[in-house]
Amino acid sequence: MPTINQLVRKPRQKVVAKSKVPALESCPQKRGVCTRVYTTTPKKPNSALRKVAKVRLTNGYEVISYIGGEGHNLQEHSVVLLRGGRVKDLPGVRYHMVRGSLDTAGVKDRKQARSKYGAKRPKAA
């Protein structure tokens, strides 16, 4: 415990909150161009081929982003929109693609949680 005199000389430091998504620079989303689209394997105990892309953002950052949903149409030079949100079992993946925006197509035949995957409302039968 510091003495009152020590606190008068040097007050307590505020704890500075560190951003979980620094590349977005306090923006809700950022645009970027895919430089590499590939699959990677998750940490133990999970097993899959997760679809990810390396993206160069408009501010110069190069980040890895997760492509959610079943199937995608992305390739190198696709223009995409990124949002924050990490993938717990993929180290280094701190961003998600926004499906149904720019060059990223929405998920086909998606019935539930459609707004998260850029899927239009299905026609009533």
UniProtKB/Swiss-Prot annotation:
Disulfide bonds: none annotated. The lineage of its organism: Bacteria, Pseudomonadati, Pseudomonadota, Betaproteobacteria, Nitrosomonadales. One of its GO terms (biological process) is translation. GO terms for cellular component: small ribosomal subunit. Residues 105-125 are annotated as: Disordered. Belongs to the universal ribosomal protein uS12 family. It comes from Methylobacillus flagellatus (strain ATCC 51484 / DSM 6875 / VKM B-1610 / KT). This is Small ribosomal subunit protein uS12. Keywords: Methylation, Ribonucleoprotein, Ribosomal protein, RNA-binding, rRNA-binding, tRNA-binding. It comes from the Bacteria.
